[in-house]
Amino acid sequence: MESLDSRAVSEILEACVHDLLAESSFFSDLSAGRIRAEHVRDVFGQFYLWRNRFHRWFGICVVKSAPFGEALPAQRLLGELIACLEQEIKGDHHGLALSFLGALGIADPARIRALPVTDAYAESFLRCYFPIDRSGDEAIAALAGRELVGPSRNGIIVNALSEHYGVTTGLEFFNLHADLEAEHFRALWEALAHCTRTDSRRLIEAARLEIWEHVTFWDDVYSAILDANSELAS
């Protein structure tokens, strides 16, 4: 059985994040400045729509959590989930996201319409972890894995937008989350290490899968936008 120590797991999963981001068509093209500015706006508009529904994923973890009174301390896991969700709600993250969209040139985010791939990703966590055969601990591990993508992903975004697209304001949203999401991973994983009976291999695999899902979401959105523009041009 693999260790659940947060540092050891972080090293395993960060290597996974690094490899997937390096293989990503969207992040590779963004880093090189190869994406047209209007397509950059379109991709981040879809990210904004997904981000507006991200808090629901925490709700799935709460619904799937163990009842009070069991041998393991469910309170600690719930406490960490609530702390992370409270930061999502009270940190004016939505306001920062709107400022970022404004810096990209998106004046009216209400006009953005979700692509099917965005809706599918937003609902993927529910489809994967709500079934009775999936444990709440696996859901929390997956959520923690998604959080761990943030620092590396955000570093690519901030560097690329400032270097290739002249975006120098509105980036606080990504700078804030670089540290915040890493803290969320540590807090959630350390709580899991003390409170779970689930095989560590299943937890690490759930985290790996969600990392893959998140990077794939960006690539799927990018591909859908390129395909739509290609059809319009033909």
Residue ranges and their predicted role:
Residues 2-234:
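Non-heme di-metal
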